[in-house]
């Protein structure tokens, strides 16, 4: 058997990748009125401009069910669970409670990805690749932690109000992002969203996003992910510029944000994740 990797649906990994590497996925929830929709399981149409649409983490019971299934599938080799930043979601805390309830602290290792979207997904992918090569529980855990701590994430949003309302961004940062600039460039720092810099035009914002990603990538090759919501053309342009400026690029993924993150980021959001050294 082999170590099994678990992540949550906000990680945004393609279904084909999840299936190929045997990654287990815990669905998070989008709340539309009185209806709770499981991300990635049930189809959903969302008005991302609505103030009434919210999200919620999986419960400890839901997490425990997935962890127990993964542990059985591992044949006792263990589970590494890589989840969205605990600063942005209650998912990691639900996972910790599930592990306590299972009394399985030695067999189920939790990793705070310090990120969201593919900033969670690529560390989970790094762990799953290591598991597929026969890695031990410690080695698979270390692969996830290494990728997560190296990762650098930069996000452009049209509005910061949704992030502030959901508690994902400070009131001060939200003010500077919404009142004084056209396109705020945010970054994840130790799992928290912070305002990195300000751009008054869309073109300057894209240029600064690319520059930040290139600087973070370094010269030794990197894994890069570009994510967006309703900004496919801009995402492809940014991806093309990154290909040109990072000739040693090891991996490049372009994908759309899933519903849980999209609720908070809003239409037009565009993000770049960089993992220096890659996530093999």
Regions found by a protein language model. Give the residues of each.
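Mixed-charge interfacial surface used for oligomerization/domain docking
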Residues: 4, 10-24, 29-31, 78, ...
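Short gly/ser-rich anion-binding loops that grip negatively charged ligand groups
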Residues: 53-60, 81-92, 113-117, 130
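N-terminal glycine-rich phosphate/adenylate-binding segment common to multiple enzyme folds
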Residues: 62-102
């Amino acid at each position: 058997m082999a170590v099994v990797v678990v992540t949550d649906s906000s990680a945004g990994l393609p279904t084909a990748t999840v299936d190929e590497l045997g990654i287990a996925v815990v669905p998070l929830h989008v709340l539309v009125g009185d209806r709770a929709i499981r991300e990635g399981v049930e189809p959903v149409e969302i008005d991302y401009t609505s103030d009434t649409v919210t999200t919620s983490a999986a419960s400890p019971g839901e997490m425990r069910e997935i962890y127990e299934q993964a542990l059985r599938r591992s044949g006792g080799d263990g589970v590494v669970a890589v989840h969205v930043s605990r600063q942005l979601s209650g998912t990691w805390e639900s996972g910790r409670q599930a592990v306590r309830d299972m009394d399985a602290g030695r067999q189920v290792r939790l990793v705070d990805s310090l990120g969201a979207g593919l900033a969670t997904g690529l560390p989970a992918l790094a762990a799953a690749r290591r598991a597929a090569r026969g890695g031990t529980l410690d080695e698979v855990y270390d692969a996830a932690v290494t990728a997560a701590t190296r990762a650098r994430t930069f996000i452009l949003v049209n509005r910061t109000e949704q992030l502030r309302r959901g508690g994902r961004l400070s009131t001060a940062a939200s003010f500077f992002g919404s009142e004084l600039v056209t396109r705020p460039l945010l970054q994840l720092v130790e799992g928290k969203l912070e305002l990195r810099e300000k751009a008054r035009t869309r073109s300057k914002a894209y240029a600064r996003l690319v520059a930040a990603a290139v600087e973070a990538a370094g010269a030794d090759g990197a894994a890069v992910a570009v994510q967006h919501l309703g900004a496919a053309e801009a995402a492809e342009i940014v991806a093309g510029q990154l290909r040109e400026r990072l000739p040693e690029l090891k991996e490049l993924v372009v994908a759309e944000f899933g519903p849980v993150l999209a609720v908070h980021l809003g239409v037009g959001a565009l993000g770049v994740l960089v993992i220096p050294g890659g996530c093999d």
